[in-house]
Amino acid sequence: MEREKEQFRKLFIGGLSFQTTEESLRNYYEQWGKLTDCVVMRDPASKRSRGFGFVTFSSMAEVDAAMAARPHSIDGRVVEPKRAVAREESGKPGAHVTVKKLFVGGIKEDTEEHHLRDYFAEYGKIDTIEIITDRQSGKKRGFGFVTFDDHDPVDKIVLQKYHTINGHNAEVRKALSRQEMQEVQSSRSGRGGNFGFGDSRGGGGNFGPGPGSNFRGGSDGYGSGRGFGDGYNGYGGGPGGGNFGGSPGYGGGRGGYGGGGPGYGNQGGGYGGGYDNYGGGNYGSGNYNDFGNYNQQPSNYGPMKSGNFGGSRNMGGPYGGGNYGPGGSGGSGGYGGRSRY
């Protein structure tokens, strides 16, 4: 039987103890299935652990079983597992942010709430479903939101961009509240704010004492300032500070999530604002615009404007340069500084 694509079978494991080895990581995760790969990312010079790694299972069902059994504790430390994001996706808005709310585009007039509930219930426990309608006409605007009780269903759903719901092709994205979008924007500058693990000035520890105490840190930091693991089979970050916390913060100086500007439901904002033509009235280049523009809605939620999310400039070899998981590229900031799981 042909295996599912690797991107559906791989987990990023953050917050590892520096004492955790590949053997102890493997031993822990093998309780949920057979691993085809397991790695603790290390500094190439000192060979010291960078505090994160990846495990790849033989099936997505095993990943689901592992994620259903959270929290995970390895070598006396609670770790943070997340479904890994492939390199080609990691530069897109929303790739690494952790949210419980899902944006669903391409909703047709004959699609009702129960269609969304029936489809998405298999992924996890649904809290709320909202299909956005026009205030005057009552017609559906072509999009809606599904909120789960956990971030993992959203992470799993967006691994596959298109879903067929009620016979129609729908596109899914992570949704951010306006406040979350503003936090991400403020963190782009690499200063101030309190988005996630702390001050982006960094300099000292990882998860612990030391100036900054963020994912970036100095030589002991969550990535040692060299980039998110220098890549891992196309799933990492390139060298140069764009790691789990390059000082520019969430997405770096080149845009960050949304690249600034108004958000979804703000005047002139719109979903994407140039990213795949969202917000310009053409959801997916005109495919989903039956009900007009997606922008200027009263909703406070939605993925934001364009810009990059961590960058995607570095390519490189198997262990040298992709953009996998919470990781940026070449100093553009990557996942860290103030990221949140």
Curated annotation (Swiss-Prot):
Modification sites for Phosphoserine: 17, 73, 137, 177, 189, 200, 213, 219, 224, 247, 312, 329, 332
Domain of life: Eukaryota
Cited function: Heterogeneous nuclear ribonucleoprotein (hnRNP) that associates with nascent pre-mRNAs, packaging them into hnRNP particles. The hnRNP particle arrangement on nascent hnRNA is non-random and sequence-dependent and serves to condense and stabilize the transcripts and minimize tangling and knotting. Packaging plays a role in various processes such as transcription, pre-mRNA processing, RNA nuclear export, subcellular location, mRNA translation and stability of mature mRNAs. Forms hnRNP particles with at least 20 other different hnRNP and heterogeneous nuclear RNA in the nucleus.
Record PTM Phosphothreonine, positions in chain: 128, 147, 164
Family annotation (InterPro entries): HnRNPA1/A2_C (IPR021662), hnRNPA2B1_RRM1 (IPR034486), Nucleotide-bd_a/b_plait_sf (IPR012677), RBD_domain_sf (IPR035979), RRM_dom (IPR000504)
Region spans: Disordered: 181-341
GO terms for biological process, alphabetical: miRNA transport; mRNA export from nucleus; mRNA splicing, via spliceosome; primary miRNA processing
RRM domain span: 9-92, 100-179
Residue list for modification Asymmetric dimethylarginine: 191, 201, 254
Protein name, per record: Heterogeneous nuclear ribonucleoproteins A2/B1
Complex formation: Identified in the spliceosome C complex. Identified in a IGF2BP1-dependent mRNP granule complex containing untranslated mRNAs. Interacts with IGF2BP1. Interacts with C9orf72. Interacts with DGCR8. Interacts with TARDBP. Interacts with CKAP5. Interacts with PPIA/CYPA. Interacts (via C-terminus) with FAM76B; the interaction results in retention of HNRNPA2B1 in the nucleus and inhibition of the NF-kappa-B-mediated inflammatory pathway.
Organism expressing this protein natively: Saguinus oedipus
Phosphotyrosine modified-residue sites: 319, 335
Domain notes: The disordered region, when incubated at high concentration, is able to polymerize into labile, amyloid-like fibers and form cross-beta polymerization structures, probably driving the formation of hydrogels. In contrast to irreversible, pathogenic amyloids, the fibers polymerized from LC regions disassemble upon dilution. A number of evidence suggests that formation of cross-beta structures by LC regions mediate the formation of RNA granules, liquid-like droplets, and hydrogels.
